[in-house]
């Protein structure tokens, strides 16, 4: 189910800008790629990529792309409901719940995604590739698969008490 970005108060953060050069007879032609994360800090986050000859235009395109790829994140209080392992390519991210007051313990690109998703107390360990694109997508992959006890109970047709034992 697609999330309508116009109903959300989204904040954006540029995670990574890459410059590539095409060598031609007259010199080098530079183009830019921007990796952008958007989120409302209340359980919605998305990632997008924009490419252009100018950086601001690449960022604008990245924001538009990110708004099209929003996912909903299950949040319990200020943390995640359970430990989850996100994978994308060779990028692997382990996201773990943390007690209140811990803060966001995560490196670079992963931190941006977790903060814009609205998680205030969470730990994350980046395993495998440290490529920003793979790390961000692995984080999104993990967050999109999070489920609360209530969601699992509804899927199984049971009460929360039956699941928790």
UniProtKB/Swiss-Prot annotation:
Residue stretches making up the S5 DRBM domain: 10-73
Alphabetic keyword roster: Ribonucleoprotein, Ribosomal protein, RNA-binding, rRNA-binding
GO CC list: small ribosomal subunit
Molecular-function GO terms, alphabetical: rRNA binding; structural constituent of ribosome
Source domain of life: Bacteria
Record GO biological process: translation
Listed Pfam families: Ribosomal_S5, Ribosomal_S5_C
Assembly and oligomerization: Part of the 30S ribosomal subunit. Contacts proteins S4 and S8.
Domains as described in the record: The N-terminal domain interacts with the head of the 30S subunit; the C-terminal domain interacts with the body and contacts protein S4. The interaction surface between S4 and S5 is involved in control of translational fidelity.
Family label: Belongs to the universal ribosomal protein uS5 family.
Function: With S4 and S12 plays an important role in translational accuracy. Located at the back of the 30S subunit body where it stabilizes the conformation of the head with respect to the body.
NCBIfam families: rpsE_bact (TIGR01021)
HAMAP family: Ribosomal_uS5_B (MF_01307_B)
Protein name: Small ribosomal subunit protein uS5
Organism in which the protein naturally occurs: Clostridium acetobutylicum (strain ATCC 824 / DSM 792 / JCM 1419 / IAM 19013 / LMG 5710 / NBRC 13948 / NRRL B-527 / VKM B-1787 / 2291 / W)
């Amino acid at each position: 189910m697609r999330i309508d970005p116009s109903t959300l108060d989204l904040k954006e953060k540029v995670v990574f800008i890459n410059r590539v050069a095409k060598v031609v007879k007259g010199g080098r032609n530079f183009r830019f790629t921007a990796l952008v994360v958007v989120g409302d800090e209340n359980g919605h986050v998305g990632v997008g990529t924009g490419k252009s000859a100018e950086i601001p235009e690449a960022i604008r395109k990245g924001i538009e792309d990110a708004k099209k790829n929003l996912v909903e994140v299950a949040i319990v209080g200020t943390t995640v409901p359970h430990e989850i392992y996100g994978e994308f390519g060779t990028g692997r991210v382990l996201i773990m719940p943390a007690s209140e007051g811990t803060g966001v313990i995560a490196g670079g690109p992963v931190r941006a995604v977790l903060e814009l998703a609205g998680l205030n107390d969470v730990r994350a360990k980046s395993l495998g590739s440290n490529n920003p694109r793979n790390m961000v997508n692995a984080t999104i992959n993990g967050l999109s698969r999070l489920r609360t006890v209530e969601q699992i109970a509804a899927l199984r047709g049971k009460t929360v008490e039956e699941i928790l034992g």
